[in-house]
Amino acid sequence: MMRGIYIVANDRVMENAIALLNSIRCYNKTVPIFLIPFNEDYHQVAETLGRLHDVKVFPDLDFLEQLTQQIGEIFDRDFLKLPNKMRKLAVWFGPLDEFLYIDTDIVVFEDIVANLDYLSEVGFFCCDYHFSGQKLRNIFSPFVVEQNIFTEKELEDVFN
C-alpha cells in the first residue's frame, strides 16, 4: 500500500510550496509527494520541489487535462470560475492508496503523515480551517439545515 501527499501548485505559488515542503520534510524525509499542476505554468516549481524535496509530478497529465475540461463543461462559470481549482480531485485517481491533500498555503508542525493512521478507523477525514464567526456560510449551504440533512448538534462538531 502506497501512502503519501498530494499538493496543487504552479510557479506563482512557488514560495508557499517551498515553505510547505520545507515543513513536511522537517518531520518526514521519505514520504512520497506528488505535485498536481494547477495549470501549464508549473515547470519551475516542479523542478525546484523535485530537486529540493524529491517531489514528483502527477503521473497522468492527460487525465488531469481531461478532468479539468469535463469539470469546466459540467459547471457553469457563474458557479465555478476556474475549473482548475478542482484539479485537486485528481487525488482519487492517482498512484497513492492512502493520501493527504494539503493546500500550499499551509505549513505543518508535526509529522503530518501520521494522520493517515486514522484511516484504519474511518474511510475519509477532512481537516480545514474555517472562521467560526462565519458559521456555515463558507462550508455548507443553508439548505443542509433547512432540509435536516445534518442536525444542529452534528454541525456543532464542524467547529471543534
Regions found by a protein language model. Name each.
Residues I149-N160:
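A conserved mid-domain beta-alpha-beta active-site/ligand-binding segment of alpha/beta enzyme cores
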